[in-house]
């Protein structure tokens, strides 16, 4: 079988090449990188040299037409370009490895998925943690009953300079995906989006809506609290709130899974920090229970794998994408996962807009902040 022809789309100065979505293909045997597209002249020349490709294009559409790749890395982080790039790739018959978050709105996500379905191509999104062998161990421990019945999940963003709306979009997308990995599809969301000021913390208004960075569209608020309802009575929360934080202090980014017999706490990455606490009271200072690390080998066992960072996660994703293409199945980090994570994010703003809990999937496919 001839190698798969791979092309790369980046945009220097506007999201560049994401978190290594261009160079991941160096580690994959069954492919040949044939071309790169970048609208920036200097960036394009640098990428051509970095990827060791003969052909480089200013216009990605021209590249798709001339090179006819089987797979394309849509690597730029700027979301305002994702829909058009993905639809063009799908129409050219190419499967896609896409930087996260998926796009700006559910309407855009719907259009991207419709194009991929129509042209029978696959799309894998860069949720590196979803492919982590440590996450597989987490699911196995939950299935074994090690934390008992799941009662609650608590997620937080990084709460750095992006606190609030931008944190929700950029880092919240990972937390939403982890919640779904653990508990399945959410059924409802109730949220409050607020803004701090001289008069304290108040609900957002239209005047608080601003354009987020990296082409992500409108964002708002610096105090966000969201609650999600899952099957079996499981509740998940996501928070991102402005507070005092000193330079160099650890952030609170990650997810806690709280069960009737214990707790699992994790963050993101190819081999993320993951720990288990056998304490039904969730109070180790009282119980004297000790946290145990969960590795790819199991609970309390040494980690046999080397942590290759997000790059290793990308390798696992594209290997799975190649297998998904060969077997005509959905990737383990699919376009449907990308849309579902975005749906949970949009539900936060929709709940704030209508002033009540909203059912998922959302009926409103436009950005709720444009409707205030």
Residue map of PLM features:
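Aromatic/hydrophobic pocket-lining residues that form π-stacking "cages" and hydrophobic walls in ligand
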Residues: 44, 85, 112, 138, ...
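Beta-strand-loop-alpha-helix segment that lines the small-molecule cofactor/substrate pocket
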Residues: 66, 70-71, 77, 82-131, ...
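Predominantly a Rossmann-like dinucleotide-binding segment in NAD(P)-dependent oxidoreductases
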Residues: 12-18, 122-124, 129-218, 355
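Conserved SAM-binding strand-loop segment of SAM-dependent methyltransferases
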Residues: 53-59
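Active-site loop of classical SDR/Rossmann-like NAD(P)-dependent oxidoreductases
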Residues: 42, 266, 306-318
């Amino acid at each position: 079988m001839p190698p798969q022809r791979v092309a790369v789309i980046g945009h220097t100065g506007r999201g560049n090449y994401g978190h290594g979505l261009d160079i991941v293909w160096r580690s994959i045997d069954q492919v040949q990188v044939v071309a790169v597209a970048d609208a920036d002249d200097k960036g394009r020349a640098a990428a051509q040299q970095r990827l060791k490709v003969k052909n480089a294009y200013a216009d990605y559409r021209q590249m798709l037409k001339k090179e006819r790749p089987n797979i394309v890395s849509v690597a730029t982080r700027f979301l305002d370009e994702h829909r058009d790039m993905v639809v063009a790739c799908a129409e050219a018959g190419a499967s896609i490895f896409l930087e996260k978050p998926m796009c700006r709105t559910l309407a855009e996500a719907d259009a991207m998925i419709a194009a991929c379905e129509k042209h029978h191509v696959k799309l894998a999104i860069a949720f590196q943690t979803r492919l982590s062998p440590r996450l597989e161990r987490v699911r196995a421990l939950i299935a074994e009953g090690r934390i008992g019945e799941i009662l609650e999940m608590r997620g937080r963003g990084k709460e750095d300079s992006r606190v609030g709306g931008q944190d929700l979009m950029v880092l919240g997308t990972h937390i939403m995906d982890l919640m779904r990995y653990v508990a399945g599809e959410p059924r409802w969301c109730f949220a409050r989006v607020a803004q701090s000021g001289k008069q304290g913390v108040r609900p957002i208004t239209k005047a608080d809506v601003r354009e987020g960075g990296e082409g992500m569209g409108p964002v708002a608020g610096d105090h966000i609290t969201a609650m999600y309802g899952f099957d079996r009575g499981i509740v998940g929360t996501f928070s991102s709130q402005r507070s005092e934080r000193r330079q160099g202090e650890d952030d609170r980014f990650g997810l806690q899974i709280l069960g009737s017999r214990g707790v699992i706490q994790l963050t993101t990455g190819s081999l993320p920090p993951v720990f288990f606490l056998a304490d039904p009271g969730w109070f180790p200072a009282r119980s004297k229970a000790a946290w145990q690390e969960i590795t790819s080998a199991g609970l309390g066992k040494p980690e046999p794998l080397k942590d290759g960072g997000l790059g290793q996660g990308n390798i696992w994703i594209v290997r799975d994408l190649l297998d998904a293409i060969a077997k005509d199945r959905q990737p383990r980090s699919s376009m449907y996962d990308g849309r579902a994570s975005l749906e949970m994010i949009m539900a936060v703003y929709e709940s704030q807009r209508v002033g009540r809990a909203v059912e998922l999937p959302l009926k409103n496919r436009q950005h709720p902040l444009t409707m205030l």
